[in-house]
Amino acid sequence: MRSRSNSGVRLDGYARLVQQTILCYQNPVTGLLSASHEQKDAWVRDNIYSILAVWGLGMAYRKNADRDEDKAKAYELEQNVVKLMRGLLQCMMRQVDKVEKFKYTQSTKDSLHAKYNTATCSTVVGDDQWGHLQVDATSLFLLFLAQMTASGLRIIFTLDEVAFIQNLVFYIEAAYKVADYGMWERGDKTNQGIPELNASSVGMAKAALEAIDELDLFGAHGGRKSVIHVLPDEVEHCQSILFSMLPRASTSKEIDAGLLSIISFPAFAVEDANLVNVTKSEIISKLQGRYGCCRFLRDGYKTPREDPNRLHYDPAELKLFENIECEWPVFWTYFIIDGIFNGDALQVQEYQEALEGILIRGKDGIRLVPELYAIPPNKVDEEYKNPHTVDRVPLGKLPHLWGQSLYILSSLLAEGFLATGEIDPLNRRFSTSVKPDVVVQVTVLAENSHIKELLRKHGVDVQSIADIYPIRVQPGRILSHIYAKLGRNKNMKLSGRPYRHIGVLGTSKLYVIRNQIFTFTPQFTDQHHFYLALDNEMIVEMLRIELAYLCTCWRMTGRPTLTFPITHTMLTNDGSDIHSAVLSTIRKLEDGYFGGARVQLGNLSEFLTTSFYTYLTFLDPDCDEKLFDDASEGSFSPDSDSDLGGYLEETYNQVTESQDELDKYINHLLQSTYSKCHLPPLCKKMEDHNVFSAIHSTRDILSMMAKAKGLEVPFAPMTLPTKALSVHRKSLNLVDSPQPLLKRILKRLHWPKDERGDVDCEKLVEQLKDCCTLQDQADILYILYVLKGPSWDTALSGQHGVTVHNLLSELYGKAGLNQEWGLIRYISGLLRKKVEVLAEACADLLSHQKQLTVGLPPEPREKTISAPLPPEELTELIYEASGEDISIAVLTQEIVVYLAMYVRAQPALFVEMLRLRIGLIIQVMATELARSLNCSGEEASESLMNLSPFDMKNLLHHILSGKEFGVERSMRPIHSSASSPAISIHEVGHTGVTKTERSGINRLRSEMKQMTRRFSADEQFFPVSQTVSSSAYSKSVRSSTPSSPTGTSSSDSGGHHISWGERQGQWLRRRRLDGAINRVPVGFYQRVWKILQKCHGLSIDGYVLPSSTTREMTPQEIKFAVHVESVLNRVSQPEYRQLLVEAIMVLTLLSDTEMESIGGIIHVDQIVQMANQLFLQEQISTGAMDTLEKDQATGICHFFYDSAPSGAYGTMTYLTRAVASHLQELLPSSGCQTQ
């Protein structure tokens, strides 16, 4: 008999440890592990972590087997793992109905349960009696299902189970926008059952999605039907959100030790090594103690001050837990494993020694990891005053299975029984490795031979869609429909993937479906859904953005292949040539670089060997599911009745005689978007007619309605000041209008009448033939829409079934070809069109911690969006907030999409912005146009609505960045029926705060430091971003800013003159922009938190921000910043809001003084008013007229709004004096004195 080797003896010791501390809790029937001998429930997350030691030990035995008994032991341990994983699978499959519901609702009530009965796999508490929604737990299951399958274990047995796992992928793929209860099952740290977006859940979901993508769940015994598919765009969403959140854990937790699981083993979800290190150092500096790490700051769990009789905490109670949070040894096991993966022997040794010192010795000397260490009740005050000095006592479960398992696993790794690659066979540990540069393959395809010839004339040789047969080309939306079939299973009543937009990562792969190769054009080229794709310059801009996105985010083997179609809509108006923007783009693509992205232009056939392929075998003919199925819930398209069909309906029909089911299905989808031509052509004779411009009709009807109600309603609602906006605006939706009023309007507008004196709708339909412009036709259709409704059959030209809606849809297409953007937006509103990606765009902004408001302030007219909403609900909210002004509702959707583009591509634009107020942004855009065009607010509003999407996006960028911009007027072609001249936006040079202004701010710092003795001037008072240039152009457009005073000058007591004319309106504009987009100085919220600790509260516009908020929230919490923001947002005027922010910044300098308390409530409004009075007094004393123009709403002088922050007449000078005067009695004798 062979002697046992040393390694064998050591492994036997670990086997006894595993048996006595983990496997003794495993149920022999279900395989689930109970939490302890007393707690019989099985938590999903704890079970998976607890079995990892068994999995690792099984692999160690297999690798180091001395004899047959060792191989048998390895098999036994591995089957214990399989039994547990299948037990969890059984628990979840019993809740298959919840998985199906959750895909659509993402509601906490429809989530899988977090814990189950160990003996029966059944649920143990009700849906609403526990924080069940824990995306990280479900994701952890999928992650280790993938890792264990890759390691050789067979866990999934049938195709039904494969379909269920595929649906679990759909369950977690929206993790980037799902607020859940997180690792600690508490949600918001007040433990009041409030879910929140957790970085740990997003990161674990990202890891799981990446790990299980293209994995065969049957392992070596599988085929293509058992492969799981993940859409790469969903993974990238998670990556983007994770990057924006870390090192913050959630809105209520500025840091959480649970993040160790996503920055290192097991998830390795973060790709930026710097971000990993920053997060790790934050955990160590803020959470680490002598016995482990706290879970998060102010965690009351099992502390002596926690009330055991209730689960929730009162908000002000959280400060009681400061410095006495329990410390968890389990986190040190993460640090040990992290050190092993990173090859950091010092870190491994340090944490091993620390952990050995706090392990509990059990029976027979076995080492046990306790759940946590707590402060003894009689030592609480001592620890609070001197953190990390009191000896703690172990509490909770012993052993803590999660911690015990990771301790054993770390020991096996440290002793060399396991290699890191064995517990990470999918190589997630290389996530931070440098990736090779991505080259994007671009193939340009002509829609037909005519376009191909036009391109050839310019020396551009491309293939047409017919040329590349047998490769099939389809619009991206078809791929969304196809993916809706993935994961469908009749046996379990699973519908498959919900119909969702598929991003450019998904459309840049080649697909093999029924042995045919398919390529899909990106969705931004698809005119089927929204009007952005009707603007060729916008398409080119989106191509540039998407190519850069592909270069940054592509993670798959092979190169991305983007198919860019050149369609008839990309021609000039007469169809004789290619649009210049499209042609110049193709030339840039030929150069090999476009917008910073490396590209290779070529024919599709050249890219077949270097592209990435996905095999969609779930559509194979031998599959049980049929493509045409009444029960295909997932394949419903929200825009299936749209007018602009695919450009490829006929292509395949020309090259094949017989069609299989797939071809019929695709053609069915394409034909559902095709509309016939019903509208008569425009009349060429320019004679008098009874119709009028759509914009004027709207204005006249609105005006008459308002007069009938006794109201004076301005037509230009987006121009400042806000007070002029009427709450009664309902400009375009007259469906609910009283009929007598409508009759009076129609009578006055001379429409054709019938015998009874009512509008003769049949004659009105006939007048469509006499219209000379599309806007005239729109007016007629609008009146028909109001009087008869969208479903009324016009019987135009004797054809039945031609409804008002059909005609509006057709008119929308014609307006798109003519590029009449005001009309396009107007008809889009009537048709209630919505951007298909609206919900995703909104979720993107929210996930980047940017709340949204739609409509104009104040509440309740301004609606806040603080959590993702279903598309229909979101659209309805926007229309409601727009006061039924459908043009504004449509523009709001457009702005949300652009903001989402920018927050992904240029997140730096949104620094220190927490809430994006779309209504105010639109208002400021109109005001900026009025300023630049030197026109009235009404003309500016009209010009704004007529901007092309490309120019609208550029204007928004200038608003966000603070850059100066220019406006060019260009008359439309003679054949265009638009009523207003076209304008375009362009940049005017580099702009920025001048050197003098910067030095002025620095000088002001030193002045204030002298005045306050102990004031700190480390931070800048006013955020210096790019501002208005002093170019000659800028001077000319600034000479008559709509809301600015006329140019004047005055001198100070020393004879120095203030020149208002040269840079007039600059700082007013700056404050208006920053106030509208809610930008605040860096570190603003943390400074507010400090000042609140020294007073009873801040009063802003009659609302008090109490000091008690600091007892609940810590300074770095997003939740605190949002709370401050909600108080500031009660101020409806953006420039006044910004002055309040400046006043608060001056006040926060007091937080750096040694004073314990300032006293009562500080009235910030009074400080601003006092500063304004000081300013006025000095202006009058130096010879300025005593009738200096003031803002009627606030009483603030326009010159004060337009003063730079620094300098003798700067706002900061007066605000500092006002603060000193306001608080003089409370300051120490050596403090501020009014100068």
Swiss-Prot record:
Keyword Amino-acid biosynthesis part of the UniProt annotation: no
Expression across tissues: Predominantly expressed in liver and other non-muscle tissues.
Pfam short name (any one): Glyco_hydro_15
GO molecular function, a single term: calmodulin binding
Compositional bias (Low complexity): 976-986, 1032-1053
Post-translational changes noted in the entry: Although the final Cys may be farnesylated, the terminal tripeptide is probably not removed, and the C-terminus is not methylated.
Phosphoserine, modified sites: 697, 731, 737, 984, 1016, 1044
Lipid-modified sites (S-farnesyl cysteine): 1232
Compartment list: Cell membrane
GO biological process: glycogen metabolic process
Main location: membrane
Topological relation to the membrane, as annotated: Lipid-anchor
Chain intervals for the UniProt region annotation (Calmodulin-binding): 808-838, 1059-1099
SUPFAM superfamilies: Six-hairpin glycosidases
Renumbered residue ranges of the record's region Disordered: 976-1002, 1032-1060
Family: Belongs to the phosphorylase b kinase regulatory chain family.
The protein's name in its UniProt record: Phosphorylase b kinase regulatory subunit alpha, liver isoform
Taxonomic source organism: Oryctolagus cuniculus (Rabbit)
